[in-house]
Amino acid sequence: MKKILIIGGGAMGSAFTFPCIDNKNEVTITEPYNKTFIKNLSSKKKYHSSLKINLPNKLKYKKYSTHLLNNKYDLVVVAL
């Protein structure tokens, strides 16, 4: 299992979470600009308003900060 960080919760970054989680990876997503996105992810449904779908339940989210990059990830995807 790889640890993957996705920076950017838009359509591309969010869509990328599905195959990553399907392949048994630990995925964390963060959004540096859109606070509404993070609010929606904190709900139980993890609803993405642009894609009009619920994101995977195993998806983790964290509030963006530069300290987040100090954690060890196998892959960092920038989808901005």
Summary of predicted features, one role per range:
Residues 1-70:
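NAD(P)+-binding Rossmann beta1-loop-alpha1 motif at the extreme N-terminus of oxidoreductases
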Residues 75-78:
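N-terminal Rossmann-like NAD(P) cofactor-binding module of classical short-chain dehydrogenase/reductase
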